[in-house]
């Protein structure tokens, strides 16, 4: 017995047989140990052949185990188990060797062991019974005329079935979604496939535009016989490159597998069209020192026209991998696959609608499909149609499906209330005092009412679930009948096709309509139902909001109120700048109502005015009121961009420079939060060339970063602040606080000297902030003191400041050229510092109120007024 004349699978089975003998404490390797090991080998050919012959493999394996247990085990010291081979096992190998010679093979393979076992082993004979000829035929089919010339022959057996999937067969079985549209690309692919040489199309397009769908569409046309005569007998196999590479342990095994696949394709005489998705992976696949990569193995067959191949890859990967190998590139014909427009996407979604309804057991409204196409096109800018629209519909269906599977909120609340009352009831039953008895009686009455309510709701939910289940079942039956009709028409079974088309399908459609009408009549409007089974445009809007953070769903009442009173909310934080507040809040309202220009940002403003008048504060308060947090504001301090080259920090370093992979500060922030407030603070400090980047943001609502990706700014509010012209404003403002026309012109003159006209012309509005008046200061004092009280609240302390003291604080800190900041510092010195010293020195108890007054010497006095008990 020469182990080197056996395949790796047989060698592995013998090794496993030795281990089995050791487990059973047997000195000899019995025939059952070898056969059991062969059966349990990973990817066992022995097992695969028996399964295809419909033999109970598990029972056969158990029979081998039972037979092994009948052999006498040997106990003792220094006994070597599994060192010798039994007479019957030796006969098995000898007989297998004779089969090897009969098949003209070079190595003993698993099929030889199986043939030998069928002749020698009684257990195997018993289970195979009268299926000997069937197994011989299966072995012949599996081998496919190949000879065992290597120690890993299984690689060559049925290579296409192992490393690919038959798309035409999947279409026949109804496993594939229908392909709608893409007729021109499919026709182009068919034309290229019909050529004599270089008949290999490669589909090139962005991810998600439907490259794979075109090949699936071709497979569907082949099944429907809607192709030229030359393609009628063809089948399309999708090659699974990952399966081809996975588990290739030995050097050259990958090449061996690929050669086996190509050999099968070649021997089919052009009947098999090989589809390789992500074809760029072939370039370099399996490449090791001195080895040939997969791309080079394909070239000769492609050139001779022996291999019909369809490839699919993206533009970037085609350029990076295939264009570099010009010899491979010239063997393919390019078919450009462009992104479909919104109308085509809606048609595609309508075609897929029924399949998704049947799969999820829901009903999809047409307006949900329209919303999915339109909203995904508008808001999800980093992906492509129709993929992103299909994903939206699928996600919305899954959301409704999960809701249908769980209890409605109303019933859930009642269930929890009943459980709570039952626990309370069991506790009160153990009490004997009158108060507890009284409470128990009240509780039992409430529990009875809640249980009655629970039963009514449960009954309603069960009724709705039953009706929905009936609808789902009827839709599934209709889908199966339509699939059966297609099969009957394809197979020219006219009698069955007529029965389905004019009998079964109309009847099922009628029954489905009746069920839907009854459900509609009984349950009323969708809003009255306990369980929702309809996907509407609202669900689509909610999912777009989840994915992007952009609010596109319908306005709820609370948000409606917030938007209508947005200017009032902003006025509470920003004092004295009515025009600026109104302009910003109006822009937000326009955007949320859906009537803003879809190709520009929500708003772009330049705030001009002296320091400390509320320019930055307005941007912060807008972010806080829109997103409930100032953290959603993207703040960029333009004083950091004083050099011309600093613009690369906004959009990312160019290729070849350090930090190219990190992206830009502005572009990356907006990609993560497309709905945000962008504050470009102190713009006059930046280099003027930096603003050239803003041109396309302000006009087109997008910016291309250093990697060539387009970043969408259409859902941002851009606010720039500057102190340009602040001196003119301070000197020429009226006593009433109004800004005169001449002052405005003087400020604009200063502005034109700094900014280029094309930037100023693209802004929605240039807002002049007026210097703060003495009246404004008193309001700001109130605001600062409110914030101080919020901080003190954590220590259960409060502060009350008299009106005289507030007026004195505003008067003393009033410096028009510096705005509100001196007031903040003045309050820190006059109130916060003395208060902090008192707190550290005296340690106020919780509930203390400190009263601050102004004495006759114009000094502030601090009195501990009262302590709350």
UniProtKB/Swiss-Prot annotation:
UniProt keywords, alphabetically: ATP-binding, Chaperone, Coiled coil, Cytoplasm, Nucleotide-binding, Repeat, Stress response
PANTHER family linked: ATP-DEPENDENT CLP PROTEASE, HEAT SHOCK PROTEIN 104
Region of interest (Repeat 1), ranges: 6-71
Annotated ATP 2 binding sites: 609-616
Residue segments, region NBD1: 158-339
UniProt-recorded Gene Ontology molecular function terms: ATP binding; ATP hydrolysis activity
Binding site for ATP 1: 205-212
Cross-referenced SUPFAM superfamilies: Double Clp-N motif, P-loop containing nucleoside triphosphate hydrolases
Domain Clp R: 3-145
Region of interest (Repeat 2), residue spans: 85-145
Pfam families recorded: AAA, AAA_2, AAA_lid_9, Clp_N, ClpB_D2-small
Coiled-coil intervals: 390-524
Signal peptide (residue range): none
Region described as NBD2: spans on this chain: 559-771
UniProt region (Linker), positions on chain: 340-549
Organism: Staphylococcus aureus (strain N315)
InterPro entries for the chain: AAA+_ATPase (IPR003593), ATPase_AAA_core (IPR003959), Chaperonin_ClpB (IPR017730), Clp_ATPase_C (IPR019489), Clp_N_dom_sf (IPR036628), Clp_R_dom (IPR004176), ClpA/B (IPR001270), ClpA/B_CS1 (IPR018368)
Keyword hit for Transcription regulation: no
Highest taxon, organism lineage: Bacteria
GO terms of biological process kind: cellular response to heat; protein refolding
Physiological role: Part of a stress-induced multi-chaperone system, it is involved in the recovery of the cell from heat-induced damage, in cooperation with DnaK, DnaJ and GrpE. Acts before DnaK, in the processing of protein aggregates. Protein binding stimulates the ATPase activity; ATP hydrolysis unfolds the denatured protein aggregates, which probably helps expose new hydrophobic binding sites on the surface of ClpB-bound aggregates, contributing to the solubilization and refolding of denatured protein aggregates by DnaK.
Quaternary structure and partners: Homohexamer. The oligomerization is ATP-dependent.
Residue numbers spanned by region C-terminal: 772-869
Protein name stated in the entry: Chaperone protein ClpB
């Amino acid at each position: 017995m020469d182990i080197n004349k056996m395949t790796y699978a047989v060698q592995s089975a013998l090794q496993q047989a030795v281990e089995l003998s050791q487990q059973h404490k047997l000195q000899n390797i019995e025939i059952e140990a070898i056969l059991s090991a062969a059966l349990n080998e990973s990817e066992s050919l022995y097992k695969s052949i028996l399964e295809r012959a419909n033999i109970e493999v598990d029972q056969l394996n158990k029979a081998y185990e039972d037979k092994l247990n009948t052999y006498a085990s040997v106990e003792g010291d220094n006994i070597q188990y599994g060192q010798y081979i039994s007479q019957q096992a030796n006969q098995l190998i000898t007989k297998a060797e004779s089969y090897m010679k009969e098949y003209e093979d070079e190595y003993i393979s698993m099929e030889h062991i199986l043939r030998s076992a069928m002749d020698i082993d009684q257990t195997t004979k018993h289970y195979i019974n009268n299926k000997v000829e069937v197994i011989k035929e299966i072995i012949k089919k599996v081998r496919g005329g190949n000879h065992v010339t290597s120690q890993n022959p299984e690689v060559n057996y049925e290579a296409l079935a192992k490393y690919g999937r038959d798309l035409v067969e999947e279409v026949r079985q109804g496993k594939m979604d229908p392909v709608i549209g893409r007729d021109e690309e499919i026709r182009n692919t068919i034309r290229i496939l019909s050529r004599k040489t270089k008949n290999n199309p490669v589909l090139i397009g962005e991810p998600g535009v439907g490259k794979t769908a075109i090949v699936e569409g071709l497979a569907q046309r082949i099944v429907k016989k809607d192709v030229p005569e030359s393609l009628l007998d063809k089948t399309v196999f999708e090659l699974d490159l990952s399966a081809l590479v996975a588990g290739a342990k030995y050097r050259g095994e990958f090449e061996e597998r690929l050669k086996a696949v190509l050999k099968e394709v070649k021997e089919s005489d052009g009947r098999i069209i090989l589809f390789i998705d992500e074809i760029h992976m072939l370039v370099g696949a399996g490449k090791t020192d001195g080895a040939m990569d997969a791309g080079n193995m394909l070239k000769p067959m492609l050139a001779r026209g022996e291999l019909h191949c369809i490839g699919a890859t993206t533009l970037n990967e085609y350029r990076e991998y295939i264009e570099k190998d010009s010899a491979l590139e010239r063997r393919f014909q390019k078919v450009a696959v462009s992104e479909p427009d919104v109308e085509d996407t809606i048609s595609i979604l309508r075609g897929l609608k029924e399949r998704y309804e049947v799969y999820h057991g829901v009903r999809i409204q047409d307006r949900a499909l329209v919303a999915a196409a339109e909203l995904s096109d508008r808001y999800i800018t980093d992906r492509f149609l129709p993929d992103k629209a299909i994903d939206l519909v699928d996600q919305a269906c899954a959301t409704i499906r999960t809701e249908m599977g769980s209890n409605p909120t109303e019933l859930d609340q009642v269930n929890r209330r009943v459980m709570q009352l039952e626990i309370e009831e069991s506790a009160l039953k153990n009490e004997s005092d009158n108060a507890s008895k009284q409470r128990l009686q009240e509780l039992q009455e409430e529990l009875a009412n809640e249980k009655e309510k629970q039963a009514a709701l449960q009954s309603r939910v069960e009724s709705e679930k039953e009706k929905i289940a009936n609808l789902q079942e009827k839709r599934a039956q209709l889908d199966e009948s339509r699939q059966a009709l297609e099969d009957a028409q394809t197979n020219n079974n006219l009698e069955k096709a007529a029965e389905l088309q004019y009998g079964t399908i109309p009847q099922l459609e009628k029954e489905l309509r009746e069920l839907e009408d009854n459900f509609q009549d009984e349950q009323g409007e969708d809003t009255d139902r306990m369980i929702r089974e309809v996907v509407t445009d609202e669900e689509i809007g909610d999912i777009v909001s989840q994915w992007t953070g952009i609010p596109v769903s319908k306005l709820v009442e609370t948000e409606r109120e917030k938007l209508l009173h947005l200017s009032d909310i902003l006025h509470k934080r920003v004092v004295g700048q009515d025009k600026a507040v109104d302009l910003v809040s109006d822009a937000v309202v326009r955007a949320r109502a859906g009537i803003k220009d879809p190709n520009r940002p929500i708003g772009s403003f330049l705030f001009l005015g002296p320091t400390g008048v509320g320019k930055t504060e307005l941007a912060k308060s807008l972010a806080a009121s829109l997103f409930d947090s100032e953290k959603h504001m993207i703040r960029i301090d333009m004083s950091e961009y004083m050099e011309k080259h600093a613009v690369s920090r906004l959009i990312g370093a160019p290729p070849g420079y350090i930090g190219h992979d990190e992206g830009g500060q502005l572009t990356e922030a907006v990609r993560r939060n497309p709905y945000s407030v962008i504050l470009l603070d102190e713009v006059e400090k930046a280099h003027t060339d930096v603003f050239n980047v803003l041109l396309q943001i302000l006009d087109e609502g997008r910016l291309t970063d250093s990697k060539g990706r387009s970043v969408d700014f259409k859902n941002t509010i851009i606010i720039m602040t500057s102190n340009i012209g602040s001196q003119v404003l301070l000197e020429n403002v009226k006593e009433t606080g109004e800004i005169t026309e001449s002052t405005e012109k003087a400020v604009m003159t200063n502005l034109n000297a700094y900014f280029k006209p094309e930037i100023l012309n693209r802004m929605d509005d240039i807002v002049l902030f007026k210097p703060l008046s003495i009246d404004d200061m008193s309001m700001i004092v109130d605001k600062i003191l409110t914030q101080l009280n919020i901080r003190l609240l954590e220590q259960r302390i409060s502060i009350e400041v008299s009106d005289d003291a507030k007026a004195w604080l505003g008067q003393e800190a009033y410096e028009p050229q510096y705005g509100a900041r001196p007031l903040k510092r003045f309050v820190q010195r006059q109130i916060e510092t003395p208060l902090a010293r008192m707190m550290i020195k005296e340690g106020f108890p919780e509930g203390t109120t400190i009263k601050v007054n102004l004495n006759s010497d114009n000094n502030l006095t601090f009195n501990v007024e009262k302590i709350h008990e």
